[in-house]
Amino acid sequence: MTISQAAGNVCTVSALNTKKHQTTNSVDSEVIYLPNTDCTIKSQACLSAFTSYRVGGAADLYVAPRNLEALQASLKYAKEGDLKVTTLGAGSNLLVSDGGISGLVIATRHLRFSHFDPQTGQLTVAAGESIPSLAWAAAELGWQGLEWAVGIPGTAGGAVVMNAGAHNSCIADMLVSAEVLSPDGTLETLTPEQLGYSYRTSLLQGGDRIVTQATLQLAPGADPAKVVAITKEHKKHRLSTQPYNFPSCGSVFRNPKPYSAGWLIEQTGLKGYQIGGAQVALLHANFIVNRGGAKASDIFCLIRHIQHQVQERWSINLEPEVKMLGEFQGAC
């Protein structure tokens, strides 16, 4: 399969031989149907449309299952074809290379359901549910515990994997259990202790297991108006301190305690520094924004430049929070 790219990551679809995974000279992609499901696999799917940075090349193969059975069928298809599997949630904490991703990309954004249990105060959600939407839903019911998460740009599955957090709270604080799917199609329910949580990370990162659903412990019974008001304040604070006028992935670097990554970058004089269409945000230095026409390589090289400059001045190695997918060798 081939990817034709111009400025702004324009992907040209080439056809896929559904039996041998070989390209043809046609520009019309054949459709791959997963047996016993209503799921189809796309070839050469442009990933820029599925990432918050709005950059990146194409996936060799892309599938977005809508239920557990289709997800298991997708993994079986990958195993039988000896395909590498990459999981994609909301694409809000990712940088996909301009060359795209080989193998099969499985998007979990269509895995959707949520259940608020008033007897236990527990919220069970599918991996593809939006974290901000869940925060608003909980607030409107008078359930406390997710107010801080209203500005987290991602899905429940991604939040569980990276231990998403804000305002001194995080997913690990309220997670009861997570259901994960192994490459062989078996399901397992894991506790927070088994997930090995620490700051913005878990044992699921870098692994091949996929989160299918999670159960969170919340606190029902509060006045909905008060919970909504607190949630609105968190959202207002987020909007006033972080850039939302341009595409970004959220925070780029983990905070190297006791310092703030944004403060270190700002004190190094890098606010507003730009490579191509990628810029260190003026509002918050731990954000890199796509000012328009940025390539993944622009963002990657800006990340490396920031790391180098901060290391030179402060002798501190900034560790990226953003996950990089694809090949970046020789990008800078």
From Swiss-Prot:
Keywords: Cell cycle, Cell division, Cell shape, Cell wall biogenesis/degradation, Cytoplasm, FAD, Flavoprotein, NADP, Oxidoreductase, Peptidoglycan synthesis. Its cofactor is FAD. Pathway: Cell wall biogenesis; peptidoglycan biosynthesis. Residues 55-221 form the FAD-binding PCMH-type domain. It comes from the Bacteria. It is an enzyme of class 1 (oxidoreductase). PROSITE patterns: FAD_PCMH. It is found in: Cytoplasm. Its main location: cytoplasm. The keyword Cell cycle applies. Its EC number is 1.3.1.98. GO terms for molecular function: FAD binding; UDP-N-acetylmuramate dehydrogenase activity. One of its GO terms (cellular component) is cytosol. It catalyses: UDP-N-acetyl-alpha-D-muramate + NADP(+) = UDP-N-acetyl-3-O-(1-carboxyvinyl)-alpha-D-glucosamine + NADPH + H(+). Belongs to the MurB family. Cell wall formation. PANTHER family: UDP-N-ACETYLENOLPYRUVOYLGLUCOSAMINE REDUCTASE. This is UDP-N-acetylenolpyruvoylglucosamine reductase. It comes from Nostoc punctiforme (strain ATCC 29133 / PCC 73102). The lineage of its organism: Bacteria, Bacillati, Cyanobacteriota, Cyanophyceae, Nostocales.
